[in-house]
Amino acid sequence: MGFYILYVCASENDRLQQLDFIILGGGASGLQLAHRLCKSDAYKASSILILESDQHKANDRTWCFWETGEGEWDDLLQNQWSKVQFKSQSIDKTIDLGDTSYKMLRSKSYYDLLHKNIAQNKSVQIKYERCTGFSDKGNHVIVNTEQNTYQCSTLFNSIFDWNILRQQQQYPVLQQHFLGWYIKTPTPVFDVQKAVFMDFTVPQKQETRFMYVLPFTKTDALIEYTLFSEKLLDKSEYESAIRDYLKEKN
């Protein structure tokens, strides 16, 4: 979940507090990294600072992933599915995943657990400050925020920078974007064991477009209209597509 850019430098005494690790971003990847460092015998005594701009992260997203058998996050799962369906105008295929499941967890339960675990390690700090930049000084890294300046030996950056993609001309840049609704039907219609992974029966409009349906009960589901394209749509376009899809399915 997420990605890291790593800078490894030697330590240096300076007027700034010297930290072993700074992690930019306290979302899924940043918290996961801090959690793993805290559990490691080699790094659990290291000084770690997590810099996160948003102090009020809640149920701001869901994460789904494939896993075989039982997993570390099973107690946090909102649901899991043992079958997935792929559908187009010419194909309708449902795959039994066997020992593998497609699992879903909500971000709040994940954030809460990892914050609790990380808080048990007194060498870890979380500060809610927006990073404005960082620079590699050869034997340390300087990190600037809107409030302070920090120094570390190793910096992990999980903050996505659009400029890196925009500045390159070698490859076209396609975005994966979507809008989802939680829906409830008056009568049972969903197979709770089956996730509709990609339903390409919606109009493609010379792009890659599909519906993604995750049922929680026979009457409750998350439905998302998903695209791979260069530009985002207006909110009304996503919602109109979902309405049309629901009308078609009665």
Regions found by a protein language model. Give the residues of each.
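N-terminal FAD cofactor-binding segment of flavoenzymes
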Residues: 49-90
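N-terminal Rossmann-like dinucleotide/flavin-binding domain of flavoprotein oxidoreductases
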Residues: 81, 85-91, 106-125
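Short, well-ordered alpha-helices that flank and scaffold nucleotide-derived cofactor binding pockets
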Residues: 35, 39, 116, 215
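Extreme N-terminal leader/targeting segments of oxidoreductases
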Residues: 1-21
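Short beta-strand to alpha-helix junction loop
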Residues: 97-116, 229-237
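N-terminal Rossmann-like FAD-binding beta1-loop-alpha1 element of flavoenzymes
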Residues: 19-45, 49
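Predominantly flavin-linked oxidoreductase catalytic cores and closely associated redox partners
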Residues: 125-246
